[in-house]
Amino acid sequence: MIIAFQNALDLAAELEGIGPVAQIEERVFPDGEVLVRLPEARGEVAVVARLYPAVNDNLIKLFLTIDALNDAGASKIILVIPYMPYARQDRRFRPGEPISSKTVLKLLAHLNVFGIITVDLHKGYVAEYAPRLVIKNLYPAEEFAKALGGVDVVLSPDFGSVHRAEAVARLLQVPYTYFEKYRDRSTGAITLIPRQDVDLRNKRVAIVDDILSTGGTLVDACKAAKTLGAAEVYAAITHCQLLKDARERVRSCVDKIICTDTVLNEFAEVRIGRLIRRELEALL
């Protein structure tokens, strides 16, 4: 059986056929507390949930949902969480900080979750923080490649996304490259230094990355690519949050924005339902 948060019913509909689909009732009380009410669900159950935005409220709803499923006698619980919140806090950056991604995964493991299907974790090694969980970290390289037909070069804005650029470029059969990022220790200013392995002059360039939040990284990479002679710059981003004035900032440079629907947004050209369906069928 598949049960879904209201904000993920569209995604759950793409999974129909694996099992019956039902909606989780959700309520927010005047004092801010939340409550869920589940349809009758036993046996193997998949919970489909977009946890962004309102990540903290949605995480509590998810914890309550899982606990209610355990009380109801579910034999296996699979979570479909397209965008995993707190994934960017993947290590302890300063003394005294938690590793927030590990905390979330540990809580889910303690709640007797069997597995999680997610899309494009910020760092893949986050999955190792919860060895008891079966974690499927998917990347829509094929879907991006189809949307980026005609591109000449795939570009990562920094070394951290090189594996994404390589995966898409391999399918497109075009070269890929990345910018080396340097931060001035006194001013904090970031400079992007291009590698010399790929010529961007008069090329259609696709920048791939996992998250578009304020747009700063993407716009800097776009400007650098156009300074190097790129004719057009596209962006293929997995999780498009588009915070503050990100839309206007990105549109000021990027010629086309392509996002997935892991987070609901106006540029969600790539749907990830088919990708998730394949993995869910294997787990249930």
UniProtKB/Swiss-Prot annotation:
Assigned EC number? 2.7.6.1
Q: Which residues bind Mg(2+) 1?
A: H122
Q: How is the cofactor bound?
A: Binds 2 Mg(2+) ions per subunit.
Keyword Plastid recorded: no
Binding-site positions, Mg(2+) 2: D158
State one molecular function term (GO). Answer: magnesium ion binding
**Cofactor list:** Mg(2+)
Location in or out of the cell: Cytoplasm
| Function description | Involved in the biosynthesis of the central metabolite phospho-alpha-D-ribosyl-1-pyrophosphate (PRPP) via the transfer of pyrophosphoryl group from ATP to 1-hydroxyl of ribose-5-phosphate (Rib-5-P).
What is the protein's name according to its record? Ribose-phosphate pyrophosphokinase
Gene name of the record = prs
